[in-house]
Design a protein with these regions (language model features):
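Short, charged low-complexity linear segments at domain edges
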Residues: 1-10, 123, 140-141
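Residue-level signal for mature regions of secreted extracellular proteins and peptides
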Residues: 12-18, 22, 159, 261
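Iron-sulfur cluster-binding electron-transfer modules in prokaryotic oxidoreductases
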Residues: 35-282
């Protein structure tokens, strides 16, 4: 498709859409082909050259508009509880989307503030946290726990009020223009904070988002205005497990009488996208 510069077909769109971006192909490929960038390019090309069925276009546009906006997504999630009893009246794709909505939306949420200061002692580091879009609504306790843990270890946490989505959702939908708008906004906002007040890292606690942030430098490698800024943001980005292991060197008492048994999910985008394998298992 790309070599012949022909419009994408229904069959090609089906295969491209089926890719989950787990990136295991990048790990297993003996030649080291970067399929992540190939599939991203393919998605953009499909979006530009293939006319999808009407309902498909409607659904993708709904996802593109709603999910990156936490307030809109929260409203939709709350509304879904009222709509579910009447889901049989809607097309299949709407019914499927309604079934994915949680029955209960968590009441916890981050305070409306930009800086979360350390609890006690001297500040040892200052980081920005990507709180995300969908996660902020569905699982806000993840961000809350991340901030508590970092504050407890004397790390000041900054949450930029103008940053919601990392941009990967529209990026994976092939909506390049919308994705790049998010990318540019995030880069400019974080870079300004980095220059004015200093940032030692940009923390991601969602592996898919972190993979995209670390790719900003590549995405804007040919943009003379954003190239250096994007590269700096990618360099600063660390998954929370990386930061805890490499920067804080947590002193965990393994000889404590109280024993803990936990399960850890080593996400595919973490292993294959970010090449983070050992933290926090070692």
């Amino acid at each position: 498709m790309l070599e012949n510069k022909k419009p994408a077909t229904k069959e090609i769109a089906k295969h491209i859409d089926s890719c989950l971006s787990c990136y295991s192909c990048m790990t297993t490929c003996p030649s080291g082909v970067n399929y992540m960038h190939l599939i991203d390019h393919g998605r953009n090309y499909v979006e530009e050259t293939y006319k999808r069925p009407f309902l498909d276009r409607v659904f993708r546009n709904i996802l593109s508009f709603v999910l990156p906006r936490p307030k809109v997504f929260l409203l939709m999630a709350l509304s879904s509880k009222l709509i579910k009893p009447f889901s049989f009246l809607f097309p299949k794709f709407i019914r499927n989307a309604l079934n994915l909505m949680p029955d209960k939306i968590p009441g916890k949420k981050l305070k409306d503030q930009k800086v979360y200061e350390v609890n006690k002692g001297k500040k040892v580091s200052r980081v920005a946290l990507l709180t995300g879009c969908v996660q902020r609504v569905i699982s806000p306790e993840i961000n809350e726990a991340t901030i508590r843990l970092l504050n407890r270890h004397n790390v000041e946490v900054v949450v930029m009020p103008d940053i919601n989505c990392c941009g990967s959702l529209n990026h994976h939908l092939g909506k390049q223009k919308l994705a790049h708008e998010s990318f540019k906004n995030n880069i400019e906002s974080w870079h300004e904070e980095y220059l004015k007040n200093g940032l030692d890292a940009i923390i991601s606690n969602t592996s898919g988002c972190g993979t995209t942030l670390k790719d900003y430098g590549h995405i804007f490698k040919n943009d003379k205005d954003l190239k250096k800024k994007a590269q700096k943001i990618s360099e600063l980005t660390k998954d929370i497990t990386e930061y805890l292991d490499e920067n804080l060197k947590l002193n965990i008492n393994l000889n404590s009488e109280k024993k803990y048994r936990i399960a850890y999910h080593s996400a595919c985008s973490m292993q294959h996208g970010q090449k983070v394998h050992d933290q926090p298992k070692d």
